[in-house]
Amino acid sequence: MFQEMIRQIQRAETISYTGKIENIVGMSIEASGGRAAVGDICQIYNGDAGGQVMAEVVGFKNDHILLMPYSDMSGISAGNFVRNTGRRLSLRMGPFLKGRVINALGQPIDGKGPFQGGTLFRVENNHYINPMTRPPIRERMEFGVKAIDSMLTIGKGQRIGIFAGSGVGKSTLMGMIAKNVKADINVIALVGERGREVLEFMEKDLGPEGMRRSILVVATSDQPAMLRKQCPSVATGIAEFFRDQGYDVLLMMDSLTRFAMAQREIGLAVGEPPVSRGYTPSIYAELPKLLERSGNFQKGSITGVYTVLVEGDDTNEPIADTVRGILDGHIVLSRRLANSNHFPAIDIGASISRLMADIVSDEHKRLAARVRDVMGIYEKNADLVSVGAYKAGTNPRLDYALGKMDGINQFLTQGVDEAFSYEEDLEAMRKLL
């Protein structure tokens, strides 16, 4: 108790720096006077309404401080006072977060009451992690999804991307993973989601079983860009807290594209030049800083699953291309497979786990290679077969593939309420071939 009092005294504000608003353009607020550093939290006092708006320092322009608000700016006007709190965004961490839903400021929004106690944890996306402190990834993380565990095996501490257009089963796959994965705890960030989809994801995709060992961090599409930008950092900070307690954490983020869009809004508002498709240079600095926070560590691990929305199913658009180069593999969801009622709609040929060869047995590698070989032969000749131009017996390898494809497709499909162990997957692959 005495030590806590000392910490409170050390954190107490002894000097208060104030300024006033000079200009507002779009979502950017310019203030003069006072002192501040990038990342400081400021309070804007709305004199007429008697309220306060929290904002973060995002840059400087001449002698003015540039601020971006965490809430609606309605009622703010030139001349309003701005006070620098001298603090950074922090939230309380503890076991009480399990099964809860919070916003991007760490405040509970599920109606289950406020948090009590816990450890105050600063949320920042500027941690440098010494690469020499990262042990090699040698253990599997079982996802309970056949197509992933058998053909795209993922290790504890690996970072994988799910690349998908809209409406191909991305949220459903995330729910399946959250329910079936052999992780100690799930941390799920929903960035820029439609408001109605949050509860729908909890009840339909995640379910009570998945929710019990999950923590949801939510910033909906109608909230300010600062909240949508902070949401992934808050979720990653929570994952880091539990990792330091020795947990193997699954961190899921939906989606990195909306995080990049929020950063684009902020960058354009403070005067950054647009580069590729309107994205600003800061995005390409923020993405690796965020993604490198996941991984395998001495005490625990953070296995990252990040979704990327591909515009017009173009997997080579700027954000998708950048993220693919940072992550340790990618899972591509195919609209063609989804349209043929093949779920999860994972395109095995277009997907890869870069660490699979290091974490599975030689037998598993041989079986997976044979399945890929059969699928590749079939795909290469699919048009020939579909128009009836192929004559059986002409190509023995194609004949073999045609005889196996129905079984392979059946093996790679899975119901949302089904779960399979790694051993069951291996046995099924042996029988397939």
Regions found by a protein language model. Name each.
Residues 80-82, 89, 96, 109-158, ...:
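P-loop NTPase nucleotide-binding/switch module
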Residues 23, 33, 46, 59, ...:
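Flexible glycine-/small-residue-rich
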Residues 150-151, 157-433:
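P-loop NTPase catalytic core
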Residues 2-5, 9, 85, 143-148, ...:
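Phosphate-interacting basic helix/loop segments used at nucleotide- and nucleic-acid interfaces
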Residues 1-109:
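N-terminal accessory targeting/assembly segments
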Residues 7, 51-54, 89-93, 108-114, ...:
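Active-site phosphate-binding and catalytic loops of NTP-dependent enzymes
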Residues 4, 84-86, 104, 119, ...:
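Residue-level signal for pocket-adjacent positions within structured domains
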